[in-house]
Amino acid sequence: NMMWRSLENFSTNSVCLIIASEKYDEDDYIRNYRDFKKLIQSDIKRESPDIETPSQNKLAHPQYNTISDCSLIEFPVIKNRAGNITPINGNNNIPFDIERVFYIYDIPSGEKRGKHAHKSCHEILVAASGSFKVELDDGVNKKTVLLNRPSFGLHIPPGIWATEKEYSAG
């Protein structure tokens, strides 16, 4: 039984690769935005965002992370006329121990993904193919980052609400 593409089942050509510091644990997810806001409320002054600032890796207290703790990581590229290679060598380019790697693909056009935060898991998102935007929210400040090169990853520490959107189409 062959299924033909139609406007109802059209998907984007984007592939989002996710590198995570924790194994899957449903209890680590914060899926309700109101619950997220309650968790991160504190007396800490949240400074204005700067996505280029390297992460301080505040592992233990997700409520202390802000969008300025998110950072772009450039991975090495080995150029070859037969196709480029981007190696990811654990702690050489990743600021945490890798426990899980997965990818999201065949995303329906106009769909948003993510829409959650983590209590303890760090993630790096990579546009392995195509492009998409990531909206970062620390409960006070918001910032949108475009990912469109497979040699760059966006490090998202715990306590940051992330929504992936506007995946590129065919």
Predicted regions and their residues:
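Conserved SET/PR-domain catalytic core that frames the SAM/AdoMet-binding pocket
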Residues: 1-3, 150-160
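Non-catalytic, conserved peripheral segments adjacent to functional cores
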Residues: 8, 12-15, 24-154, 169-170
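Short acidic/polar capping segments at secondary-structure boundaries
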Residues: 3-4, 22-25, 161
